[in-house]
């Protein structure tokens, strides 16, 4: 008896193995972290490499408020974000932070530096800590995108409709209210 192979054994492993982006800086970073992932036995470099290879929608932005909340309990660590660090106007005082990210918005950079913190690039981070010691990997919420609100197609998932207008006549009746036949 043979084993039942899905698609006759031609199933590829998930996840990207190569960078799709044409960004030369990103290409250099991938080259650097491929080398480090191969030569060091620490999972930090493998995780950073995996996240660098991800599509842009998985490099979600992280606000300064969330960043500072995560770093409260780790005052001497460097926050590593494979994505963008954005400013948050609701935050009055930014604590002293050490941040390494692919991109940092202009306002966020000014606020971090004004509080006595530092903003590092990935090559500076590698020079300082090649095995990821005293580093905390953080990521933004990938499901917070506007597009994701339209995807909920499970039962009672309440997906957001694509409508040209939000008036009385537009996708407000059948299937949306119990009083109009049924509510999905």
Swiss-Prot record:
Species this protein is from: Theileria annulata
UniProt-recorded Gene Ontology molecular function terms: RNA binding; structural constituent of ribosome
SUPFAM superfamilies: Ribosomal proteins L15p and L18e (SSF52080)
Annotated region described as Disordered, given as residue ranges: 156-184
Keywords: Cytoplasm, Ribonucleoprotein, Ribosomal protein
Subcellular location: Cytoplasm
UniProt protein name: Large ribosomal subunit protein eL18
Gene Ontology CC annotations of this record: cytosolic large ribosomal subunit
Pfam families assigned to the protein according to its UniProt record, in alphabetical order: Ribosomal_L18 (PF17135)
InterPro entries associated with the record: Ribosomal_eL18, Ribosomal_uL15/eL18, Ribosomal_uL15/eL18_sf
GO terms, biological process: translation
Family, similarity comment: Belongs to the eukaryotic ribosomal protein eL18 family.
Compositional bias (Basic residues): 174-184
Domain of life: Eukaryota
């Amino acid at each position: 008896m043979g084993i039942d192979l899905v698609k006759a054994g031609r199933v590829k492993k998930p996840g990207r193995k190569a960078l799709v982006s044409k960004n030369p800086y990103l290409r250099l970073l991938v080259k650097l972290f491929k080398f480090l992932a191969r030569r060091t036995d620490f999972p930090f470099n493998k995780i950073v490499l995996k996240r660098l290879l991800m599509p842009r929608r998985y490099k979600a932005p992280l606000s300064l408020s969330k960043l500072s909340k995560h770093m409260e309990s780790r005052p001497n660590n460097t926050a590593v974000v494979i994505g963008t660090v954005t400013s948050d106007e609701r935050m009055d005082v930014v604590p002293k932070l050490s941040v390494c990210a692919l991109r940092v918005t202009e306002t966020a950079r000014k606020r971090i530096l004004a509080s006595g913190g530092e903003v590092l690039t990935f090559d500076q981070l590698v020079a300082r800590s090649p095995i990821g010691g005293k580093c905390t990997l953080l990521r933004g919420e990938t499901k917070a995108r506007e597009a994701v609100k339209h995807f909920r197609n499970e039962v009672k998932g309440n997906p957001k409709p694509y409508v040209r207008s939000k008036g009385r006549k537009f996708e407000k009746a059948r299937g949306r209210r119990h009083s109009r036949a049924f509510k999905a």
